[in-house]
Structure formats: structure tokens, C-alpha cells
């Protein structure tokens, strides 16, 4: 079997937290790079992404304050996503091509077994204390909103085979929390006109504009 769904010891299908976190981070990274396209300090892989000593997290390039870096655990915590409804398994055979002859490489054929439209549920937790420790501005909430909106609209993928139409997703998001940030985030994701035209969101936009322009 070349590729199959991941299961726990009891046989339960799940999405590992690492896979969900990685997919979310990759989507957010694309957004960040688009916004900061003309600032190599915020985009380059050689930018400040090492927090080896105490308080170094405050000096990190903006993106890494939110998604973690060497010596700095990301303020976003993700749990394993569990399957909540039975889903049909669909096997598929893949043909391997010999790169020298252009013909079928029989011994290298492989098979995948995927789930058809499975539904998973899990939690993201944003640690506001860690955001504060990194001196991350309110822009982090807007970047989260952008990324969650993409997932709500089906723009994203998780796992193997995106080019083969595997891993597509369409998310549903429910925001819990009583902080002002949670209320605004709920409003953005719910297209609340009052929130979208509110002063709090204007502040987030200005904070993001400032963050992507910083020399880290």
C-alpha cells in the first residue's frame, strides 16, 4: 500500500495535529508572502527566525512570532482532528512511469486508499499570553482571519496528492472566547457588517501594514 489514512492504535482514523498545523501554516505563509512581497526582511528564509535566548522571540520576523521558530513554540496549539462520521473508503491504483523509457514501471506501481468526503473535528487554541510574550501586535488576528476565510472557502489542502485531487477541504469554524479579539474574529468570519466597518478591524489592518513593513 503506497498511501492510506492514518489510524491510531485502536484503529480510529484521525488527522495528526502536525498535518493540520502544517497545512494551516503553509496557507498563512502564502498570504504573508503575498502581503510582504516587497520586504525581503519579512520574507527571506534567512530572516530572523531563531530565538535561542530569553526574550529573543520579541526580535523574530513577524510571521515566526505567530507560527514558531527555533527556540520559540508557536502560540497556536492544534490537537489531532478526529473523524466524526463514517466515511467510504475508495482505493485507487497508480501507474508508475519509467523516466528513461517512458513506459510503465510495473514493479513501482502503487495504490492509495482514501476516504470520500470525511468529516473531521478538532480544536485550535491561540495562547494570548504567548502572543504578548513575543510582542506580537493585533495583526496576528487579521492573518488568522485571512487564513480561516481561505479554509472556509475551500482554498487549502491537507496531506498527500494535491495534484491528484486528494486532500481538498472545506472548513466550518466556530470561535469560542470572550475576549474582544474573539468577538471581532467571529464577526469577520460571519461577515458581520458592524464588525467589518468597525474601528477594531481598522486597527488590525494598520497593525498588519506596520508588521509587514518592519525590518526584523
Give, region by region, the residue ranges found by the protein language model.
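Small/polar/charged residue-enriched interaction surfaces, especially the RNA/DNA-contacting tracks
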Residues: 1-216
